[in-house]
Regions:
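N-terminal single-pass transmembrane signal-anchor helix
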Residues: 1-33
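N-terminal helix-rich module
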Residues: 2-3, 27-57, 61, 65-183
Length: 183
């Protein structure tokens, strides 16, 4: 008697496979989202850091003021740091980019999933590299959790640093030593 062998999967095998894949997806997908959010925050803070460092360097190199600020038209500074940021020589010291004032560099608009807390005024680096304000630019992801926030610290001497967690509480600190906040 010949036995016929059927190839394929039983309903139970398919259900077990679907259950295992669902469990794996439930573990992997949230982790992937966290990784993506962290990557976006890192990119944004690194771009602002690079722009600030360039602005400070050029101010000292050319012995003139360099302004770093957000702008919607690459001419006028605005207070909304979600717009692209620019750095330019401010030869006449009026805080606006004139036709004879060189645009040194700019960043893209911030990713739509992040928000930023920053000073309402422009950052101005003088010929010695000092800044007009001591501040922290804080960038948060869409969860608004402080332990995910990143910060760019700029002090009056022009020192630029990425915020660190110096007290091991899981939250980076701002220029004053207080925990970064997303609210």
């Amino acid at each position: 008697m010949l036995s016929m062998r059927h190839s394929g999967y039983t309903l139970v095998e398919l259900m077990v496979t679907v259950a295992v894949l669902s469990i794996i997806a439930g573990v992997v997908v949230p982790g992937a989202r966290g990784f993506i959010n962290h990557s976006i925050l890192t990119k944004e803070i690194n771009e602002l850091s690079a722009l600030a460092r360039l602005a400070r360097f050029k101010a000292m190199e050319e012995q003139t003021e360099v302004v770093m600020c957000p702008s919607s038209d690459y001419t006028h500074c605005i207070s909304n740091w979600t717009y692209p940021s620019m750095a330019f020589y401010d030869v006449d010291g009026n805080g606006k980019r004139g036709t004879n004032e060189t645009l040194l560099s700019s960043t893209e608009k911030l990713h739509s999933s992040v928000k930023i807390k920053a000073p309402s005024q422009a950052l101005v680096f003088d010929a010695r590299g000092g800044a007009n304000v001591t501040t922290t630019l804080t960038i948060c992801d869409d969860t608004s959790k402080a332990d995910k926030a990143v910060g760019l610290i700029i002090n009056g001497y022009g020192k630029i640093a990425i915020a660190q967690d110096s007290d091991d509480d899981g939250i980076n600190e701002n220029h004053a030593g207080a925990a970064l906040s997303c609210s």
